[in-house]
Amino acid sequence: MRFNLTIKTIAAVIVSSMFAVSCSKTSSVPYVDSSMGFVTGDNLFTTDAGMTYDFTTAEQFDFEFGTRLFVSCEVGDCIDPAKNLFSANLVNCSVPVTGAIVRPGTSGFDKSEWKDPISVNNAWISGGYMNLYCSWTGHKNSGVVQRSAFVFEGTSTGIDNAPDTLSFSLVHDSEGDGFSSGGDAANLVMINKMATFPVQEFLPSGNAVIRLLWTWHRSDGH
């Protein structure tokens, strides 16, 4: 079954700035933030909205500089107003699926090989990236690493001053571990994963509509 979701880029600007809380020496901001961003130093994480969190007490926060992550944390006191830097307690983090955006006909990419079902539960744009909360099926403890890719399908010009529509497809390859693999159906589980793909070069300077397409299976597996 084919699904699509439309996103207006003007809304994405609002999403990316929702948690841009001002930082002052006396402020304490007791809330949980869940954001995409990058590792910007030892134990430092900067969100797409410009917040920087210091996870000095998090032993498990051991990622290379520049790694893109999805992080949930409890935000604490302001450390440096000039840098919008806060102390924070890490709740959890994950490395999202990512990769360069491809186009139909790209050398080495055969879209027909990426035909397994994937579902999009949420999507937003921040930091020049399309961020997606996805689900697919796989067999428990199989060890198989499934693959997802993001395909730019083209642009439709708006009529009568309407914004242009940019179409993207999220496609998936279960590597033989998915719903229709013929494996033990009783051992199938739902796998939830974040994905993030750089879309800045495709976005116009003005407003646009993003049309996102993906394929999921019906209850009978088709």
Regions found by a protein language model. Give the residues of each.
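Bacterial N-terminal signal peptides that target proteins for export
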Residues: 2-10
